Curated annotation (Swiss-Prot):
CC per GO annotation: chloroplast nucleoid; plastid nucleoid
Pfam families the record matches: RAP
Name of the protein this chain belongs to: RAP domain-containing protein, chloroplastic
Record-linked PANTHER family: FAST LEU-RICH DOMAIN-CONTAINING, LD45607P
Disruption phenotype: Retarded growth and photobleaching phenotype. Enhanced resistance to the bacterial pathogen Pseudomonas syringae pv. tomato.
Xref: InterPro entries: FAST_kinase, RAP
Subcellular localization(s) per the UniProt record: Plastid, Chloroplast stroma, Chloroplast nucleoid
Lineage: Eukaryota, Viridiplantae, Streptophyta, Embryophyta, Tracheophyta
Keyword match Lipid metabolism: no
Domain RAP positions: 607-665
Organism of origin: Arabidopsis thaliana (Mouse-ear cress)
PROSITE patterns in the cross-refs: RAP
Length: 671
């Protein structure tokens, strides 16, 4: 329907012969009624309340967008004729409008068409680290600072804004409601909780002080409310372990496995978590799917060699925290393989910096289910705790017993990893070592290959093992695995055992293997073998297992190369070194003792001061790790007096005066 309205009689238009055609494309009837007051002021009143007046530039632009025809409306408007109309409403809203404009929520010029809402992705795994929402959050922080300083009125003057107060017709509202209702599933994850992640330190400190003050009000009422919220969260998490739909479980598991990146895996899992939290029942989040999701995330990180900082940023995401919390909730219901996958995944994602309480939880559950573990589970769980420097004595005692009962099912790579784990955390492994001595007595049971073999120790699929344990099992090792086993026996002080003798004799067959100083793997292997050989010469010369002179020289040259052995002096070590000068003694820094480098040494009196940082100790128990104990024992066997100074003990003394007194105290009797 269209109507032609002659405006020549109503307005002084330039040019006067212009006629405007108004076409209604949406079947809305446009009724035009003229009055004498509107003639005088140059205003065209319309029956549609949304566009009651046409005169000011903002209204002219709006009508122009609707009709696409009225291009020559007058600019002058008689405010007295309009009376109390839209301008008064606009002036009342000016104080609040500048804030909306400052945050980018409205169009300051009102000349652009309204932005269409883009289709939002279901989940954004790394939105906080890679997205551009930090701009909006920075403006919100600035807005809080402006309001706190009482500068809102001045900002309103600096940023004037005339915003129309539009009144939408009922038909339009109904249509938009319909559209909004259809888009609800796509916007499930668009919450404002993510905006709290990247506030600056000043705002966080202010908010922390405010929380402390509020918590002390009303007799701790707010603290009680906080505890209730935690209980509600625990109840909500408990519903994830309820009955589930088998078909939904299979579909979710397939989607997790087919995801090619860690971000995709987390996105698929986060969708389901949010859906279950909003009432999806039965839940497809079975313990198997949760363990698989964590395992695939870690494996995809390994596949692309994701940097450590990137992994930590990934682990701090809200979706990732929810997934780990679910894994801890359903951990008792997981199978042995699921517990193994979760522990391995946490070690790869968080390393030694994250998941302290989570690993305690894993240790508790794993100890209760250790009887269900196979050789692969035992090796992977032990390796996860060792790589995170997380001590778990009770768990490792049970793992040693379990490994001794199924020793014939172990592969060479699994034995190497298990022994390295016990040695790294300096955990006793007598049942395991005794079973190795009894199961592998002959050197014919050991095979060595010089090239690296692709192993699948981290895969979910279990290895098939023959049930015929009556025959003598055979083990295959590569060069690096032999080095790890030999180093582990040296750390544990068990080089007199028969299994070590067989391993060491097999390792000597690598005499023809060419060691190069240009490759890190060769240098690491040579360093391990060199230290073990020195331990054999110093601690157990009666065994006569030390290497021949030619091979010893070759390994010594590769192990002592500076290409991959660059020394880094920590600030802690520098601080202690400055205080040692005041003792008046001639201390030597980075002194070499038969392959080991002593931090500070008094060479004349053979006193070695070891300045041990956090990497020398377990992160949760504070006990020395295996490599630290081996160094102390070896330097002591070389005839030196070893004094250890840990960072934790150092920080307990404040001020240089107290620290110097502590140094003199621990050195008493050695100098």
């Amino acid at each position: 329907m269209e109507c032609v309205v002659p405006f020549r009689r109503c307005f002084c238009l330039n040019p006067p012969e212009t006629r405007h055609r108004i076409v209604n494309h949406n079947h809305r009837n446009l009724h035009i009624s003229l009055s004498s007051s509107s003639f005088a002021s140059g205003i065209l009143p319309l029956s549609n309340k949304k566009y009651r007046f046409v005169g000011p530039l903002a209204q002219r632009s709006s009508l122009h967008r609707r009709t696409d025809s009225l291009k020559h409306l007058p600019f002058s408007v008689n405010a007295s004729v309009i009376g109390n109309s839209e301008e008064e409403v606009e002036e009342e809203d000016d104080d609040g409008d500048w804030e909306a404009e400052f945050l980018g929520e409205i169009d300051p010029l009102d000349i652009q068409p309204p932005k269409k809402r883009k289709k939002q992705k279901n989940s954004k795994a790394l939105e906080d680290t890679e997205g551009m929402d930090w701009c909006v959050r920075a403006r919100k922080i600035a807005l809080k600072s402006i309001e706190a300083r009482g500068l809102s009125s001045r900002m309103a003057e600096v940023m004037p804004l005339k915003k129309k107060k539009k009144k939408k017709s009922k038909k339009v509202i109904v249509k938009k409601d319909k559209v909004k209702s259809k888009s609800i599933p796509e916007d499930d994850f668009d919450t404002e909780d993510e905006d709290l992640d990247f506030e600056d330190g000043f705002v966080e400190d202010k908010m922390g002080d405010l929380r402390k003050r509020v918590s002390s009000l009303a007799g701790g009422m707010f603290e009680e409310k906080k505890e209730k919220m935690k209980e509600q969260l625990a109840q909500r998490l408990s519903q994830f372990s309820g009955p589930s739909d088998r078909m939904k479980e299979i579909n979710l598991n397939k989607a997790i496995i087919e995801a090619q990146t860690a971000e995709e895996v987390l996105e698929v899992t986060a969708e389901t978590i949010m859906a279950v939290a909003k009432g999806l029942s039965p839940s497809p989040l079975s313990p198997l799917n949760i363990a698989t999701a964590l395992h695939r995330i870690a494996k995809n990180m390994e596949k692309v060699s994701m940097m450590r900082t990137r992994r930590l940023a990934f682990a701090r995401q809200r979706e990732m925290s929810m997934l780990v919390a679910l894994a801890m909730t359903c951990l008792p219901e997981c199978s042995a393989q699921g517990i193994s996958n979760i522990s391995w995944a946490l070690s790869k994602i968080g390393g030694e910096l994250l998941y302290l309480t989570e690993m305690d939880r894993v240790a508790e559950v794993a100890t209760s289910k250790v009887g269900e573990f196979n050789s692969q589970n035992v090796a992977n769980i032990a390796g996860a705790f060792a790589s995170m420097r997380h001590s778990a004595p009770e768990l490792f005692a049970e793992l040693s017993k379990r490994a001794s009962t199924i020793i014939n099912t172990f592969k060479g790579q699994e034995i190497a990893q298990l022994l390295w784990s016990f040695a790294s955390l300096y955990e006793p492994a007598d049942p395991l070592l005794e079973s190795l001595d009894s199961a592998f007595k002959s050197s014919d049971q050991f095979k060595c290959y010089l090239t690296k073999e692709i192993t699948n120790s981290d895969e979910v699929v279990d290895a098939e093992v023959s049930d015929d344990v009556s025959r003598s099992p055979a083990l295959s090792f590569n060069r690096d695995q032999l080095g790890n086993i030999a180093w582990s026996y040296a750390v544990l002080g068990q080089v007199e055992r028969p299994f070590f003798a067989n391993i060491w004799n097999t390792l000597t067959t690598l005499e023809e293997q060419r060691l190069s100083e240009q490759y890190r793997e060769d240098v690491m292997f040579a360093s391990q073998v060199y230290l073990v050989n020195q331990c054999l010469k110093l601690e157990c010369p009666h065994l006569q297992l030390s290497l021949c002179q030619e091979l010893e020289e070759k390994i010594s040259r590769a192990g002592k190369t500076k290409r991959f052995n660059q020394k880094i002096t920590s600030s802690f070590q520098k601080e202690v070194g400055r205080l040692l000068i005041s003792t008046g003694l001639d201390w030597a820094k980075e002194h070499d003792v038969d392959g080991y480098t002593v931090d500070v040494a008094l060479v004349e009196k053979k006193v070695a001061l070891e300045i041990d940082g956090p990497t020398h100790f377990s992160r949760n128990s504070g006990l020395p790790l295996g490599h630290t104990m081996l160094k102390r024992r070896y330097v002591a066997a070389a005839g030196w007096k070893v004094v250890s100074l840990s960072l934790q003990e150092w920080e307990e003394h404040e001020g240089s005066h107290e620290q110097l007194e502590y140094l003199r105290e621990i050195l008493t009797g050695c100098i």
